[in-house]
Amino acid sequence: MNLPNKLTLTRIILVPVFMVFVSLTQIGTEDFNPTWYLVAGIIFAAASFTDFLDGHLARKWNMVTDFGKFADPLADKLLTTVAFIYMLRDGVCSPVVLCIILAREFAVSGLRMGAAGAKDGKVIAANMWGKVKTVLQMLTIIFYYFGTALTWGNSVMIGADCVFLSYWLCWLVAIATAISGIKYLWDNRSFINTAK
């Protein structure tokens, strides 16, 4: 297994680690500990960086593989969807936003698996809108977890601004997610039609 694919697997492994720290505390409760959100934010930021790094190295070293094309967006989905579920728990992410994200991910993942299981074994890579969507999602999540940690520190106003920004970014994420999903299905409509 090459290095870019190892980085992708590392991102998947970091998902349950992120979940552990976010689950240790909850904003709005008496025993809320911002340190755990800070640690979770650092873990998420590190995992997000591997998303940039694995793609960059795969292209630079000509190590693009079918596994990478399939596993890289899957790792992104796991990481960001889990984070948004916890943001919903905290009251920052609207259920509407999460439903749009889940609907898009299920539809696109279903299409990818269907294409991979077809006779020609086609692997559908992420498109530009999918990458824009992922970057927006990751920035929103990073703003939220670091912002939440700061609201209980010495930089209350900066932290509050970050949390406020992350709330509105969630809606921007919903728009980008919907557009990327529609474009993805449209670009692969020929496969969808033949699969009927």
Language model regions located:
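Alpha-helical transmembrane bundles and membrane-interface segments of multipass inner-membrane proteins
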Residues: 1-196
